[in-house]
């Protein structure tokens, strides 16, 4: 029977980053992905990397992630295509301005001192296509940006294999053997594996992996759409990721065109990734309001992926006490690509050193039983 110190269920950015961090510390790692690495939510995300969150723990996590991505190629030998064009949050309601004032105070306190306020006139200069008629203010952080999900995932996977990790594609986890309250092994579509520790990195499918161990992991899948225009020079590659916070509409330069998206707040949870063309019409309607020039941009392609959403829009990181040897790195609620680099480091530290350099206690699974939920408000 095959065996491993750690089995990772899921080969998206989180699983691959964790495989790398554990393997480079001489842990015998087996990662199992039922399709191909990075082919699900990771491969369908917008690639955003930001630090402007409402929860301090998320800001600290993201400051670490940005530093990791800045040094990614030097560490892994693989480019990340991390372009720090910044994130511009566009605020149109008085309550948003008040909330972001509190955010800004916290950001500066924890060291994100480059984040600053931008008035509507400056925002219009930064993003010439932006309609600022109803804008009350904006926040901007120049060290935020966008990176390539494919490059970062591939870089982690290659580096993990270089350190001895086994990453298997086309192999599905179909069961977890639990005896006397602890993990004993996993069953897969190609055979059984003996292990004492399983990491649930299955993204939108994390609840299914949890149920295999008799656990209820509160993660639901929600469809999110992305559209990319044809060539559109009015949004140059230096423009920031721009977010209309009230509607969740966002856009950023993508190649010689523009990538845009928006949350469908009426879409129920489910695993469909079919494109809803009626909803895409709403995206373009909002684009025409917030950035009128985009109304003339032709659609080049569109797709949909899945958010893995928890009740408080915060990740679940660390051990699940009910089953010894079952750990989670899931439920990132749309922030998995940007948070995985730091989460992988901190989880490997917690597992091997019994403590992490940044406290990830706020992301513990036990918060659900305690009812100690504090929602992350800056969700797109």
Show which residues each predicted segment covers.
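Dinucleotide-binding Rossmann-like beta1-alpha1 core, especially the glycine-rich loop
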Residues: 47-126, 248-250, 286-288
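Active-site lid/adjacent beta-loop-alpha segment flanking the redox-cofactor pocket in flavoenzymes
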Residues: 216, 231-328
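Short beta-strand to alpha-helix junction loop
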Residues: 60-61, 90-98, 140-158, 274-279
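N-terminal Rossmann-like FAD-binding beta1-loop-alpha1 element of flavoenzymes
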Residues: 4-30
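Helical element adjacent to the flavin cofactor pocket in flavoenzyme catalytic cores
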Residues: 139-196
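Glycine-rich FAD pyrophosphate-binding loop
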Residues: 23-43
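C-terminal catalytic lobe of FAD-dependent flavoproteins
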Residues: 288-380
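Central helical "cap/lid" subdomain
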Residues: 191-238
């Amino acid at each position: 029977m095959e065996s491993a110190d750690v089995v990772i269920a899921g080969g998206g950015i989180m699983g691959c980053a964790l495989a790398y961090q554990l393997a480079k510390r001489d842990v015998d790692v087996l990662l199992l992905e039922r399709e191909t690495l990075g082919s699900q939510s990771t491969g369908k995300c917008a690639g955003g990397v930001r630090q402007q969150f409402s929860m301090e723990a998320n800001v600290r996590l993201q400051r670490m992630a940005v530093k990791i991505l800045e040094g990614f190629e030097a560490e892994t030998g693989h480019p990340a295509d991390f372009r720090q064009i910044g994130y511009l949050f566009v605020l149109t309601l008085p309550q948003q301005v008040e909330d972001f004032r509190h955010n800004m105070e916290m950001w500066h306190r924890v060291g994100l001192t480059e984040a600053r306020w931008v008035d509507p006139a400056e925002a219009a200069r930064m993003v010439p296509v932006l309609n600022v008629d109803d804008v009350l203010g904006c926040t901007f952080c120049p060290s935020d940006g966008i990176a390539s999900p494919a490059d970062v995932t591939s870089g982690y996977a290659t580096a993990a294999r270089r350190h001895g990790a086994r990453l298997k594609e086309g192999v599905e986890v179909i069961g977890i053997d639990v005896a006397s309250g602890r993990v004993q092994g996993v069953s897969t579509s190609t055979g059984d594996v003996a292990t004492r520790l399983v990491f649930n990195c299955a993204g939108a499918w994390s609840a299914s992996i949890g149920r295999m161990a008799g656990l209820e992991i509160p993660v639901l899948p929600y469809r999110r759409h992305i559209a990319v225009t044809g060539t559109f020079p009015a949004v140059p590659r230096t423009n920031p990721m721009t977010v209309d916070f009230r509607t969740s509409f966002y856009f950023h330069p993508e190649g010689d065109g523009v990538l845009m998206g928006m949350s469908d707040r009426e879409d129920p949870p489910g695993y469909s990734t079919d494109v809803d063309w009626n909803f895409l019409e709403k995206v373009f309607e909002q684009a025409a309001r917030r950035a009128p020039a985009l109304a003339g941009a032709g659609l080049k392609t569109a797709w949909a992926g899945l958010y893995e959403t928890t009740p408080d829009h915060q990740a679940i990181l660390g051990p699940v006490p009910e089953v010894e040897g079952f750990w989670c790195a899931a439920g990132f609620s749309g922030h998995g690509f940007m948070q995985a680099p730091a989460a992988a480091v901190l989880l490997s530290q917690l597992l091997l050193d019994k403590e992490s350099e940044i406290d990830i206690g706020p992301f513990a699974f036990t918060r659900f039983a305690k009812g100690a939920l504090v929602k992350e408000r800056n969700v797109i």
